Amino acid sequence: YRLQEAGLAVDVASISRGKIRGKHGYEVVVDKALAEVDPQAYELLVLPGGKAPATLRKEAAAIAIAQDFMRSDKPVAAICHGPQILISAGVLVGRRATCYRSVAEELKQAGALYEDQEVVVDGKLVTSRQPADLPAFMREMVRLLGKASR
């Protein structure tokens, strides 16, 4: 909702259309299946955390979207377990990043430069560790979008 407050149109994508239920029982409408997403039509890729990245990282469409954003040097924001998708996409080598503590070793093995900070910004890549870091994560994501749109 913070991105919508900042005046951005938001589409939620997942394996298929319909509804998904978040950790605290909130339902979210899925606007597009991953296969329907054209990365060139979007300014920002947000990879939320929780349990979903463990499934999404096995989806070829999710990997292709992440690779396209990183290759195009477009803003990418990942929090908690979200960086697992970037790990599977092979796009973190030499990049500064953070993630949920249980993913940290995997992040390092993928060639990322792990930093245990509430938010890490490396170019147009924004990463955070956990839900408690959301204020810093959102602040940096919105700031980055402001720079990217100029």
Enumerate the predicted regions with their spans.
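Extended, subdomain-level signal for the structured scaffold at the beginning of enzyme domains
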Residues: Y1-V76, Q84-V93, A104-R150
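Catalytic nucleophile serine of serine hydrolases
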Residues: C80
